[in-house]
A protein has these predicted regions:
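Terminal low-complexity/charged segments
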Residues: 1-123
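Generic structural signal for well-ordered secondary structure
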Residues: 11-15, 38, 52, 150, ...
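Hydrophobic alpha-helical scaffolding
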Residues: 45, 49, 155, 159-163, ...
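Structured, non-membrane catalytic/scaffold regions adjacent to prosthetic-group chemistry
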Residues: 47, 51-71, 178-194, 201-208, ...
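Short, conserved phosphate-binding/catalytic loop or strand-edge motifs used
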Residues: 76-78, 208, 226
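Active-site- and interface-proximal helix/loop "cap" or "latch" segments in soluble metabolic
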Residues: 98, 102-206, 211, 233
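Aromatic-residue-lined binding/catalytic grooves and analogous aromatic/hydrophobic interfacial grooves
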Residues: 210-238
Length: 238
């Protein structure tokens, strides 16, 4: 299950269709399925397919459609006009168990997120993550487009995945139009995507080293990441 969301269908609140995107590894394909119109509630799939839990929570939060039988139904980003609000966090009981709350403001230059740890000594028993502090409603800006600002919006969805999001959006438009990008463009996209991947993976390795206070490796990875980030200048001048 790659994606699952709801599309409003009519003026009645809580009405719409569910759209799911499924990936099949056997033949490397994606399939899009759409449900019949529904209102108010539907049987939760999380009970049998755990990967659906976050999607169902988001559909409930955005459209008020209740997944009946969902084992842990609570907001993803907002509740009662306050954002974000993750509801009640999972808690582990025990005399030696302590809770650690981290974020959303962090010491490093990263996007905000709240992390709730349940620990017993040095052992982390459970981690729950609350995101969405920078949710900007990009999805709702897309209908009726593409607009002049659409590609810029795609490039700024996530700062470290500019090429990935821009390429994904371009390929969606090409598929809808029945068009195919020139071979040269496909090669340039592949090259840019690989450079972005290398920069991110090297940055992650440096982050792991920094988290365990192994600073020489962290510094080396930072330098190498900078080299990868500068290489696109040779390709497109930026």
């Amino acid at each position: 299950l790659c994606a699952w969301f709801a599309v409003p269908d009519g003026a009645e609140a809580g009405s719409g269709r569910r759209v799911a995107v499924l990936a099949f590894d056997a033949d490397n394909t994606l399939v899009v399925g759409r449900s019949l119109p529904f209102t108010r509630s539907y049987p939760s799939l999380t009970v049998t397919h755990a990967q659906a839990h976050l999607f169902e929570r988001e559909v409930w939060e955005q459209h008020g459609v209740i997944p009946e039988g969902h084992p842990w139904l609570k907001p993803v980003r907002s509740s009662a006009g306050t954002a974000p609000a993750n509801g009640t966090f999972f808690r582990v009981d025990g005399a030696e168990v302590h809770e650690v709350a981290v974020g959303p403001i962090h010491a490093g230059i990263i996007e905000p997120g709240h992390f709730r740890f349940q620990c017993a000594g040095e052992e982390v028993l459970h981690l729950e993550i609350a995101l969405g502090y920078q949710h900007r409603g990009v999805e709702r800006a897309l209908p009726g487009g593409p607009h002049r600002a659409t590609m810029s919006q795609m490039e700024t969805v996530s700062g470290d995945a500019t090429i990935a999001h821009a390429t994904a959006y371009a390929t969606v438009l090409e598929a809808l139009c029945g068009a195919e990008a020139p071979l040269r463009s496909q090669w340039l996209r592949a090259l840019a995507l690989e450079l972005e991947r290398l920069a991110n993976h090297v940055g992650d390795l440096g982050g792991l080293a920094n988290d365990v206070a192994f600073l020489p490796t962290a510094a080396a990875c930072g330098k190498i990441r900078g080299d990868f980030l500068n290489l696109p200048d040779l390709v497109c001048g930026n």
